[in-house]
């Protein structure tokens, strides 16, 4: 008997339907038309196309992220699932106070800087006292009129007003009754003495001090008349016994009736100038 004929009649490995389906499906991949005719080949083709599209989109996004963020962008784009999980865990956790941890670690925390926006100065309301120089005056006046000041605050203007006020106060003090020039009483004319013209008090004092060598000689000069603006307010003046003070020996003898050219307290007497001593006594 021929062996080939036996194989055809009794096959060694009988084929099943599953095996025939796999073989036919593999043969259908040879062309698009035959693949679309086979059901299994069509499903496999559609799934493969979808996966290929997802892979292409993933790679294109990673390339664009690399151009924008550098090489690390590729890893972040490929591991998007890991990144999403990390972000989700980060949102669930409590925020960490880095400044507190730095203090515990022994590192000084940075100084806190608070930035505030620059605002324009607001206009203020001042009372109108009907004066030209009322830019920053905040005083009560009889007028009840209130007007809005449109100008902004100016430090130079405030300084100028302060100087003007100080100047006005000094002028008022200069014209006060306490600083008015004193009245000078007419001195009595004694026998043998003639009135002498008035002269400067300072020059008279220097001249009398220079003539200390001739103490026995009479000083033929009138007692000086001092100006209160030069010696202050508290000066002592007495018109009694003026003739005794005109003598030369009055410089060596203390006299309680001598007019003091310097300010004194409680109107104490002036002892005069002593040629033997270099200090003055009040």
Curated annotation (Swiss-Prot):
Subcellular location per the Swiss-Prot or TrEMBL entry: Membrane
Location (main, coarse): membrane
Keyword list, A-Z: Amyloid, Glycoprotein, Membrane, Phosphoprotein, Prion, Transmembrane, Transmembrane helix
GO terms for cellular component: cellular bud neck; fungal-type vacuole membrane; plasma membrane
Modified-residue entries (Phosphothreonine), positions: 141
Region (Disordered): 153-183, 246-282
Glycosylation sites: 91, 132, 276
TM stretches of this protein: 43-63
Annotated function: Not known. Seems to be able to provoque the non-Mendelian trait [PIN(+)] which is required for the de novo appearance of the [PSI(+)] prion.
Stated name of the protein: [PSI+] induction protein 2
Organism annotation: Saccharomyces cerevisiae (strain ATCC 204508 / S288c) (Baker's yeast)
Gene: PIN2
């Amino acid at each position: 008997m021929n062996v080939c004929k036996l194989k055809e009649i009794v096959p060694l490995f009988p084929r099943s339907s599953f095996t025939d389906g796999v073989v036919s499906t593999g043969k259908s991949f040879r062309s698009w038309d035959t693949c679309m005719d086979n059901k299994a080949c069509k499903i496999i083709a559609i799934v493969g196309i979808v996966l290929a599209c997802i892979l292409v989109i993933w790679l294109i996004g990673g390339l664009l992220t690399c151009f924008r963020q550098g090489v690390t962008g590729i890893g972040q784009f490929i591991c998007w699932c890991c990144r999403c999980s990390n972000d989700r865990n980060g949102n669930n956790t409590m925020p960490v106070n880095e400044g507190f941890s730095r203090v515990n670690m022994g590192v000084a925390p940075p100084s806190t800087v608070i930035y505030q926006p620059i605002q324009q100065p607001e206009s203020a309301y001042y009372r109108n006292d009907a004066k030209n120089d009322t830019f920053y005056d905040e005083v009560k006046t009889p007028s009840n009129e209130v007007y809005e000041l449109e100008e902004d605050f100016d430090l130079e203007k405030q300084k100028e007003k302060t100087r003007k006020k100080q100047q006005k106060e000094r002028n008022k003090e200069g014209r006060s009754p306490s600083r008015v020039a004193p009245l000078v009483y007419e001195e009595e004319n004694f026998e043998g003495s003639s009135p002498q013209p008035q002269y400067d008090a300072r020059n008279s004092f220097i001249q009398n001090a220079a003539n200390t060598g001739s103490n026995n000689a009479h000083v033929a000069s009138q007692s000086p008349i001092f100006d209160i603006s030069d010696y202050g307010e508290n000066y002592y003046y007495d018109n009694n016994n003026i003739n005794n003070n005109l003598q030369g020996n009055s410089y060596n003898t203390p006299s309680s009736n001598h007019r003091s050219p310097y300010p004194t307290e409680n109107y104490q007497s002036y002892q005069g100038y002593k040629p033997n001593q270099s200090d003055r006594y009040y």
